[in-house]
Amino acid sequence: MTSKSVNSFGAHDTLKVGEKSYQIYRLDAVPNTAKLPYSLKVLAENLLRNEDGSNITKDHIEAIANWDPKAEPSIEIQYTPARVVMQDFTGVPCIVDLATMREAIADLGGNPDKVNPLAPADLVIDHSVIADLFGRADAFERNVEIEYQRNGERYQFLRWGQGAFDDFKVVPPGTGIVHQVNIEYLASVVMTRDGVAYPDTCVGTDSHTTMVNGLGVLGWGVGGIEAEAAMLGQPVSMLIPRVVGFRLTGEIQPGVTATDVVLTVTEMLRQHGVVGKFVEFYGEGVAEVPLANRATLGNMSPEFGSTAAIFPIDEETIKYLRFTGRTPEQVALVEAYAKAQGMWHDPKHEPEFSEYLELNLSDVVPSIAGPKRPQDRIALAQAKSTFREQIYHYVGNGSPDSPHDPHSKLDEVVEETFPASDPGQLTFANDDVATDETVHSAAAHADGRVSNPVRVKSDELGEFVLDHGAVVIAAITSCTNTSNPEVMLGAALLARNAVEKGLTSKPWVKTTIAPGSQVVNDYYDRSGLWPYLEKLGFYLVGYGCTTCIGNSGPLPEEISKAVNDNDLSVTAVLSGNRNFEGRINPDVKMNYLASPPLVIAYALAGTMDFDFQTQPLGQDKDGKNVFLRDIWPSQQDVSDTIAAAINQEMFTRNYADVFKGDDRWRNLPTPSGNTFEWDPNSTYVRKPPYFEGMTAKPEPVGNISGARVLALLGDSVTTDHISPAGAIKPGTPAARYLDEHGVDRKDYNSFGSRRGNHEVMIRGTFANIRLRNQLLDDVSGGYTRDFTQPGGPQAFIYDAAQNYAAQHIPLVVFGGKEYGSGSSRDWAAKGTLLLGVRAVIAESFERIHRSNLIGMGVIPLQFPEGKSASSLGLDGTEVFDITGIDVLNDGKTPKTVCVQATKGDGATIEFDAVVRIDTPGEADYYRNGGILQYVLRNILKSG
């Protein structure tokens, strides 16, 4: 998106590339920009081009040009992303909101067609496919069929959206994973619009949007509310960050993969601490890192904790763009633009960074990470001994939540990251587990291994013994690795070598392969390696996120029963980016991240209790032991196969009709028209009530009087506590709603898949089974006290909220430190508003959730420094009056407001709460009742 800049620095110029001329905004017109890191040059150009004299001023541009690398971030800027990418879980509610805005505009006498993305938006349907079937030739076809049966209603809605909105396109199911499609096709690196050339930048409704950083495209994950606003032309508010320079030297050694490098970098950056910072790779070693490896590193930025992890543009970028079928004209523009703007990587020029780290790639060794955090790297040589130490925490009463493992908390599922790719099934760490460390369910063998062998008989799989540590899932999955031909063909060559030596996968291993792009299928075909993968059980199950986000599908019944009946701690090995406990499969406690070749190696081994150095994987036909080193492909073999099997034509052919879809997609009955015909019986897509009763001009904001406390919460309440993504529990308000609408229990699906239906989502707000509402003693889950009833009895939070609404009683929520940490799940703010909550008062807020609350018209207030609900003597039974909010009507933002709590006996407690509306823009959003109302009124004003 481009706009007419005020051009304070006279930066507007022309760039000629071949026969074409483009308008650009030259960075060298602004003093001091040459010393900036690449990532900040991208931000500086963004401000220069979008300077409007109010939101973005000359002072903002000078602030970034004169950036002090050592200072703590304090200067807020308005960043305007060039485009938006989405996946279907988070994208559906965005399009629901846009459809609702169209109707609201029409109701207010405006033109509904004015509600259109101003920044191009692409949605890739990749989060819904589940690996239900596996290990058979028709697995892909059947899984897609089941996917359409489950999600047809949502897909019809997205097809309508594609036709109704300009600049909004949908990549249909069974095509690929959003981030891989982004690097292979959607990303242009330099964009052009209205004759202006500028850096490609994006925000996405998924944390791993950062994969595109590998191409030199600045992008990261945001919440749905921010993504919608960005689509409608609103800038993203951010602080100019600290930038960590990560110098790469040396070369990767034989036998080491890009996965090993990224797990090593994850461990280093987690230990260093990069939350809220940009990471930028630089140095002479950058040229040695292939683009696919760069994308793998960028992808795991959320696991590092950083906002972005970017590589600058260089010859390798150009080579990749050419290789993936970008036009010669586009490739020439990228090179010319990068060189003209000082954005071309010069290994001899060292920019200024806030902090410095270095990795010699020759020091990296084969590695895995687990059993429950991506940063917990284990050298493959130590994998068996480490597993034997870890297993004690997972059997009997030796639990991962026991005192010697302080890390396992629910918060970890989304710890310090941008919005997560939501898992299909989540099980949560129990805060109440016994701490007796005696192992009751296992016999400790003489060699130190914890063991509980269980004999399993299966008509289909035969007879075998399962024990703790058995690998029951081996999944080549996730855009993190399936975008990388080196590891994907490395895995296939390892499979070939294994089959030729007579090795087979163990019968209890669920083996799946789900690439992020159809190009992988092509090069497996062309190289003739598919049959070897299939011989080991690795059949194609889908093109989508599958196991990486918890859509691993059920384990075979006999295996699941043996695991649960005998409390076995079994394992999954996957080539994904997250391995939090309970994320991959409800039956699996221990999850390990590994490269695709190692996924196959563990399928052959069948257990984590295995030392590849000393233990053979089996015997060849001559009875000779076969070790992993005997079947590991040489670097030459991998390179030769890549050269012979992959070409540009594969990319151009696969992406020629990327938006077309298969017959199922094309034959979906799809409504037409510029406004959506809502189905009153739908349980997936419903019109939300955000704009009901909205007027063309905002009503004055009011103080809050007579409020009751809906929830009194402690520290580190995450957005997953507030709005869970996983399974819907029978008997809860959300389940009751689905029951009443004729939905069978087996078809409840997850909260994540039902985000287009506010009725389900309101009932799921504050409904996490691990939530502790301190209004109640020793109760966890979505419960509160309902003070509309005599004695304030226990009730579901949703039911109590309905009773309060019926009596026009406003609500407040109290929180501790780090309220709203974790994923920037927009439904955590939407659900809070729709329950009738007017204010959240906490000791501190996570940045994105705080801004999301304002974006929904809920005021975030902070206790005075050092104070909390308990230190002030509040127990949540009081009635609250909050005054001073109405000062906002005078165009000012109050620093504090007065909170008065009246106890049952008439005694009062007063304190001044800090108003956490931090910018003038946020004040405008709050005055309008939210960011979408603000945008909608601006559209109305513009005629």
UniProtKB/Swiss-Prot annotation:
Pathways per UniProt: Carbohydrate metabolism; tricarboxylic acid cycle; isocitrate from oxaloacetate: step 2/2; Organic acid metabolism; propanoate degradation
Entry keyword set: Iron, Iron-sulfur, Lyase, Metal-binding, RNA-binding, Tricarboxylic acid cycle
E.C. code: 4.2.1.3, 4.2.1.99
Tree of life domain: Bacteria
Binding annotation for [4Fe-4S] cluster: C479, C545, C548
GO molecular function: 2-methylisocitrate dehydratase activity; 4 iron, 4 sulfur cluster binding; aconitate hydratase activity; iron-responsive element binding; metal ion binding; mRNA 3'-UTR binding; mRNA binding
Induction: Transcriptionally regulated by Rv1474c.
EC class (word): lyase
Gene Ontology biological process: propionate metabolic process, methylcitrate cycle; response to iron ion; tricarboxylic acid cycle
Catalysed reaction, written as an equation: citrate = D-threo-isocitrate; (2S,3R)-3-hydroxybutane-1,2,3-tricarboxylate = 2-methyl-cis-aconitate + H2O
Keyword DNA damage in annotation: no
pH dependence: Optimum pH is 8. It retains a high specific activity over a broad pH range.
Cofactor binding: number and manner: Binds 1 [4Fe-4S] cluster per subunit.
Cofactor dependence: [4Fe-4S] cluster
GO CC term, one of those recorded: plasma membrane
Stated family: Belongs to the aconitase/IPM isomerase family.
Function in brief: Involved in the catabolism of short chain fatty acids (SCFA) via the tricarboxylic acid (TCA)(acetyl degradation route) and probably via the 2-methylcitrate cycle I (propionate degradation route). Catalyzes the reversible isomerization of citrate to isocitrate via cis-aconitate. The apo form of AcnA functions as a RNA-binding regulatory protein which binds to selected IRE-like sequences present within the UTRs (untranslated regions) of 3' trxC and 5' IdeR mRNA. Could catalyze the hydration of 2-methyl-cis-aconitate to yield (2R,3S)-2-methylisocitrate.
Subunit architecture: Monomer.
The protein's name in its UniProt record: Aconitate hydratase A
Species of the source: Mycobacterium tuberculosis (strain ATCC 25618 / H37Rv)
Lineage of the organism: Bacteria, Bacillati, Actinomycetota, Actinomycetes, Mycobacteriales
Gene designation per UniProt: acn
